[in-house]
Amino acid sequence: MGNDTIANMITSVRNANLGKEETVRVPATNINRSIGKILLQEGFVKNLGELREGTNHFMILTLKYRGRKREPYITTLRRISKPGLRLYYNYKKIPKVLGGMGVVIPSTSCGTMTDREARQKQIGGEILCYVW
C-alpha cells in the first residue's frame, strides 16, 4: 500500500491553518508542486519555496492570513478523489464550489489546473481537491 501524498499535504496545510502557523513543510512531489502552484496563483498562500535535506526534498508553503485575528484565507481544503475511490468528471460536469468562489483542482491529461482552466480548455479529469 502506498502513501497518499496529496492527502498528507492537505492535512498538513489544514493543521497549520488551525494552529495559525506561518509556514508548513510538505514532501515535494510533482503533484504537490502543481497543487502548491495553483494555491499560490489563486492567492491562498503567500509564497512557495523548496528545501533539500540530504536526499529528501520538501516544499515550504507560506500561509496567508487576514486581519488582526489572523483568519486563514484557506477556510476549507478537502480531498475528493481518493486512492480507494477515484472520481473522474467530464469538463461539463466539473462541480463549482460555492458558486464559483472556491477552486476545484482537477488532474487532467494536460496537467493539474483549476476548474476554470479545465472548462475553458474543455478537458475533464480526476478531481483531486476543493479549496475555499
Swiss-Prot record:
Pfam family, one: Ribosomal_S8
One GO cellular component term: ribosome
Main subcellular location: plastid
UniProt record similarity statement: Belongs to the universal ribosomal protein uS8 family.
Species per Swiss-Prot/TrEMBL record: Huperzia lucidula
Superkingdom of origin organism: Eukaryota
UniProt GO BP: translation
GO molecular function ontology, one term from the record: structural constituent of ribosome
Compartment(s) of residence: Plastid, Chloroplast
Keywords attached to this entry: Chloroplast, Plastid, Ribonucleoprotein, Ribosomal protein, RNA-binding, rRNA-binding
HAMAP family documented for this protein: Ribosomal_uS8_B
Name of the featured protein: Small ribosomal subunit protein uS8c
SUPFAM superfamilies reported in the protein's UniProt record: Ribosomal protein S8
Quaternary structure annotation from Swiss-Prot or TrEMBL: Part of the 30S ribosomal subunit.
InterPro entries: Ribosomal_uS8 (IPR000630), Ribosomal_uS8_sf (IPR035987)
Described purpose of this protein according to its UniProt entry: One of the primary rRNA binding proteins, it binds directly to 16S rRNA central domain where it helps coordinate assembly of the platform of the 30S subunit.
